Amino acid sequence: MAGDGWTTLPLDQAVLVNPSVHLERGDVYPFVDMQAVDPESRSVGPSEERPFKGGGSRFVHGDTLMARITPCLENGKIARYAATEGEGAGHGSTEFIVIRGRPNVTDNGFAYYLTKWDGVRRYCISQMTGSSGRQRVPTSALSHCEVTIPSLPEQRAIAHILGTLDDKIELNRRMNQTLEEM
C-alpha cells in the first residue's frame, strides 16, 4: 500500500537504465564478468583490468548491475558496482542491465533495492525472450514494469535501513566463514 507522496511510474522512468558512461576505446578499465556477481552479496568489485573495446555494459561506482540472461537473473545476480578507486568507471559483460537512481526521482541506494525487489525481478523474468536456455530480458520491458516509489527522503531512509541490515548479514557471513576455517 502506497503512503502519502508515493508515486507509481514505469521502472524506466523511476531509474536510469543503461546510463551513458564515457570510456576511451583501448584504455584499460576495471572489468566485471557475470561470474563475479554473487547473489548473496550486495556489491561486486572488478574481476580484472581489461582494455575497453567499445561494447558491453558501462557503469560507475554505486550503479546496480542486473543480469539480463537466464539462468543468472533467476539466480538473483543483481549487485552494486563497488569501484576500487573512488568514482571510477568500469565495464562488463554485455549481459548486464545497468540501473542508476534518476536525479530528483530516485536515490541510487533505493534504486538497487527496488531492482532487487522480488516483484521487479519476477516481472523481468516473465518478460524474457529468445530461445530456450539463452533467454534475455529486453531493456524495453522495463518501460512496462510499474513501480511505486516514496519521496526521496523516505527512499534514503529505506535504503539506509536495508543497507544496515545487509551490513549485519555480511558481517555474520564473514564470521561464520572464519569459524568454519578454524
Task: List each language-model region with its residue ranges.
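Short, positively charged
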Residues: 109-139
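Active-site donor-binding loop signature of nucleotide-sugar glycosyltransferases
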Residues: 34, 101, 147
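Non-catalytic DNA-recognition/assembly elements of restriction-modification systems
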Residues: 1-22, 148, 152-159, 163-182
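A short glycine-rich beta-alpha junction/loop motif
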Residues: 89-97, 129-159
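A short beta-sheet element
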Residues: 55-57, 61-117
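Sequence-specific dsDNA recognition surfaces
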Residues: 8-67, 72-74, 80-81
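Residues that recognize and position ribonucleotide moieties
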Residues: 4, 30, 89-90, 113, ...
